[in-house]
Amino acid sequence: VSEISDVLRKQWESLCFNEAKFLNDVGLSEPAGEKGRTALEMLWSRPTCDVNGISGGYQGEGFKTVIASKASAKVSFRLVGKQDPQKVLSSFKEYVQESLPLDCSVNFLGEKGSKATEMSLSHPAFEKARDALSQEWPKPAKFIGSGGSIPIAGYFKEILDMDSLLIGF
């Protein structure tokens, strides 16, 4: 996974982002993720492995001491840069299988994914869009990251050889 450019890093550092307040607002005392990374780096430019849901065993109110025979988890990955979804998936499967206790098994379902897409911020159209947005708002527009695996943007890049500028407000 490549590092962000110095230009982008300086843009992010110029934001009035209070990391301590942000972390407090989301219930954390320190960033959860890669050591030595800022919260914005982890939110905007780094890959993730997210456990979106876990189920298994007794789920009603009260206590039960019966050990579940089955459990499930919904897991997703945010890919960035040139990460290959099939390689990430196979690495994850290999890790899980190697970590299984004796006499346990695992099944994987829904094994689809999209390639990450990284846009060239040096493209003149991107700078023109940033300038236009900056004219409409009281502060200069900044480029941020927002994951990297938005499928349609990847298809535009792969099939049409066009970058996509995704604008959020």
Task: List PLM regions with ranges.
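Short amphipathic alpha-helices in soluble, non-transmembrane regions
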Residues: 88-97
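Midchain, well-structured core segments that form catalytic/ion-binding scaffolds
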Residues: 1-83
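Short glycine/threonine-rich loop-to-helix capping motif typified by GTGT followed
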Residues: 7-17, 116-125, 154-159
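A short beta-alpha structural unit
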Residues: 77-80, 106-122
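Hydrophobic, well-ordered secondary-structure elements that form the walls
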Residues: 75, 129, 156
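Phosphate-moiety recognition in structured ligand-binding domains
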Residues: 129-130, 147
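Flexible, glycine/charged-enriched surface loops at secondary-structure junctions
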Residues: 1-3, 101-108
